Amino acid sequence: MIGTKWPSEKHTFLDPVSGQPVTQLTDQYLNFHLYFTDNSFDPSCENIYFQSNRCNPEAERCQLFRMNLESGEMEQLTDDPAGIMQAQVTKTKDGKLIAYFTGKELRLYNTETRENTLLYEEKGDFILSNLFFSCDSKKIGFTRNEDRDTIPDGGPNYLGFKEKMFAIKDGRVSVINVDGSDFHDVLRDTHWISHFQYSPDDPAIAMFCHEGPWNYVQQRIWVINMETGDFRPCFRQSEEDCVGHEFWSEGGDIIFDNRRDGHDGTISSSGTQVFAEETGSGRTPYFGFAHKDGTVYRKIDMPFYCNHYYANADLSLFVGDAVKDIVLISIDENGGTKLTTLARHNTTWKYQRSHCHPNFSWDGKKILYSADTDDTHDNIFLVEVPKELL
């Protein structure tokens, strides 16, 4: 029920690998923070928004919650019958507005007034996904892909992921004003479209991806003008590139992970890839840094196997989720890298919700990540960045 408050479940322990204090914020049910391209923290860094099935533990029907990090108290904010799927929540940087998908509805929640409004209802045979606010908080962009699933994507160990890539021939980038007006498609494509993200400093610019195993996708990242519909590739890929998990830096540049040939961008519960054997050339993976026009202006070798990376505000420190550990990667002025283990996460990697998706707090002092232990427990963890790395 909306407004229900849950007592603190948090407790702190010393990580067995790094010795760093780690605070486990939840210890019951399924819980996970927002997708790594969004930030779960409010501007004060005193509260986080997250999803949980604690109000419906017999199913994976999750709702939206807010937690005060000092007290650990949690409050339920939504109670939609269809629930909210993982990674289908986004919010404005100031934390005032939250948008999410439930079933075929796009809804808007105002954290100040607590008003919850229906903005859009899908009437066609499309699946809604990947929503994101423009930086001026006036529009919400999202993807709509034809519902052609023979095997539903999102199962264990990327079940249905490759099949969905081949099946979808109608993918769209759509937009709507936050008052519910002027819904329209900006782009219609012949590929599964995903990972839509507005630029953090230009409300007209966004990026999206052609989704699928990285070794099957010919061109992953695209930059689009949301006012004109013009789009262009970001970093023109060659046969030896396997690119993905792109995100915007706070300064408005695009950062992407190029693992080179032989990598599909997945990880399974066995700790290995799903769709590719590691038979590539042995070329060193790297981070690419690109401007909004898609041109790459910097590359930094990144010889570490992490599944997702994210950067702090000044790009001096990256966080990643390696097979077993949450790691920090510091970058010096010459592009040199140094890896520091922050915590052993022990996640199973079985489901998308098992992925750690680590991210920084807005002030860059804390790392938030999720990890599971079995099919019915998924928890959220908080760890401070060591002072010597700040």
Task: Give, region by region, the residue ranges found by the protein language model.
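Blade/loop signatures of beta-propeller domains
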Residues: 1-23, 167, 171
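Short, conserved, GDST-rich strand-edge loop motifs in beta-rich repeat architectures
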Residues: 2-4, 52-60, 143-168, 209-218, ...
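A short beta-strand motif characteristic of beta-propeller blades
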Residues: 23-29, 73-79, 115-121, 182-187, ...
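Blade-terminus and WD-like Trp-Asp/Gly-His loop motifs, strongest in beta-propeller folds
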Residues: 38-47, 87-97, 101, 130-140, ...
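Asp-box/WD-like beta-propeller blade repeats and closely related beta-sheet repeat scaffolds
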Residues: 79-171, 185-188
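Conserved blade-ending motifs and adjacent loop-strand segments that build the rim/top face
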Residues: 238-242, 297-310, 336-360
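Loop/turn-rich, solvent-exposed surfaces of beta-rich toroidal or solenoidal domains
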Residues: 249, 253-270, 275-288, 294-338
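Blade-level signature of beta-propeller repeat domains, shared across WD40, Kelch, NHL, RCC1
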Residues: 354-390
